Amino acid sequence: MQPGTDEREWREDCAPRRVLEIFSTKWTSMILHTLHALHDGRARTGVLHRSLPGISKKMLVQTLREMERSGLIHRHVKGTVPPAVEYSLTSLGHRFVGLVDLVYDWGRQNSDALDLLQERPSSRRKSGD
């Protein structure tokens, strides 16, 4: 929201809601972080799939398509046989990685407190890990 904007008015298209919408998908931040931290901002689909344990190929492709529509990554199809598809961070994606890193750093610094939270049914983490 712009300075002076009434924060009681949370329109569907306001910036804070759009940012939280990006974070609300389970894999988006992990894919951004993985592209940036492990692959210097660009990687092929198979490399990303091997770098993200627990994600299905279908979910990876679905998330990559959504990230492309959001302007976070660019999809480049190389003219090889068979065609090779490579994904790279856009300038917006590079800027978003900074925010992802802040959240991940906070998680690392507060892991003890997070461990005390009640486990969510969708969490695969077991107590004692």
Put a short name on every predicted segment.
Residues 2, 13, 33, 98-129:
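Amphipathic alpha-helical dimerization/coiled-coil segments
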Residues 45-81:
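Canonical helix-turn-helix DNA-binding module
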Residues 79-103:
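Basic, amphipathic "hinge/linker" alpha-helix immediately C-terminal to the N-terminal HTH DNA-binding motif
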Residues 28, 40, 69-72, 108, ...:
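Generic structural signal for secondary-structure transition and capping sites
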Residues 10-59:
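N-terminal helix-turn-helix DNA-binding core of bacterial DNA-binding proteins
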Residues 1-9:
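Acidic-glycine-rich active-site phosphate/pyrophosphate-binding loop
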